[in-house]
Amino acid sequence: MARFKRILLKLSGESLMGKQGYGIDADRLADYARQIKEIHDMGVEIGIVIGGGNIFRGLSGSQKGFDRVKGDQMGMCATVINSLALSSALGAIGAKNKVMTAIRMEPIGEFYNKWKAIEYMESGNICIFSAGTGSPYFTTDTGSSLRGIEIEADVMLKGTRVDGIYTADPEKDPTAKKFDSITYKEVLERGLKVMDLTAICMCQDNDLPIYVFNMDVVGNLKKVLDGEEIGTLVHN
């Protein structure tokens, strides 16, 4: 039996670039789709949020002269593009799924509704939540926290390029030590960059644990659902 019944999987848009350094890498996308289908076949109910950093990041856009609100809206559109790509990849291997958007844009996706999303997941669909929260100034991490809380997920699985949370950036500090588990309180006290402050506080206040792991290693998603300790658990 899977470790969790219902999950919110947060994927990095930047990870979708793969080695090409921009856009969507077809091989990386296919890897993600296969890993997701593998745990879906175990009976896990899955909601997914993907970032848009491989296409456009609103905050960095505002630093280049874009209006912040319009920049964030461009970022929301980037998450929709990634969501459609993942939806297509999942559909190609027989995984039923629905793209839901925080802003009305039918027929590209269905306007998000908590109860409909839960109904879809319970009936065997993977739900892909796009366009963030629908409002500017909120990151996709915050959108993930919101959707995870709303769909009553057991955990948020944050798929990243590193295998957990460290005392410092392991790419810059070879002495950095990895946490197997850590409380929200300690994350905040240490100033660790797990997610932005709003997202962290939302998860803390609503008792939604986060499991940080390396999604880029094929097979890791199933290992997490099988109960293997390959990342870092953040909890109250």
Model feature map: region roles:
Residues 1-236:
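C-terminal catalytic "cap/lid" subdomain
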